[in-house]
Amino acid sequence: IAIAGNEEASIGTMLRTGNVKYDEVDIINVGWALSSSLASGKVDAIWGGLRNFEINQLALEGFAVKTFFPEEYGVPTYDELIFVANAQTYDKSAIKGFNKAIEQAIIYIINHPQDAWKEFVAYAPDTLNNELNRRAWRDTLTRFATRPSAVDWQRYDEYAQFMYTHKIIKTLPKA
């Protein structure tokens, strides 16, 4: 695993759906060497990888993998990227402008994936223009939120309850 701080709760929840206890598996911190650890046989599974990257990296290296998405195995759905502003000093108009720019970029990428890809790789073609990034790009397209400034308070409350129940947090916030 790559240590995230919630691995016991998340992995434990997923394992329980298969009647396996967390303490019945050996957890090995491989840092960020997820793909190479799995490919080398050092570990039998990895946790902490990106949905659009490690799967593709391993496939390109000739390894067939089975993916287990946490939300399909008892872990509440959560947003993987959240922009946070200081509650005391934020600039409301700057945040609105930022969110609008993110939304416009996402809509452009979804509507014009090939043009957006060309613009992306033009930044650093020697390192970005390769098959792994092409596959990751393709898989990322389906994950974009078309309304990035929208907030699902119930989703946040459900994940907060999950973290509180598993003692990741000491107090239960209300979204």
What do the PLM-derived regions correspond to, one by one?
Residues 22-32, 67-68:
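Short beta-strand-to-loop elements that line the ligand-binding cleft
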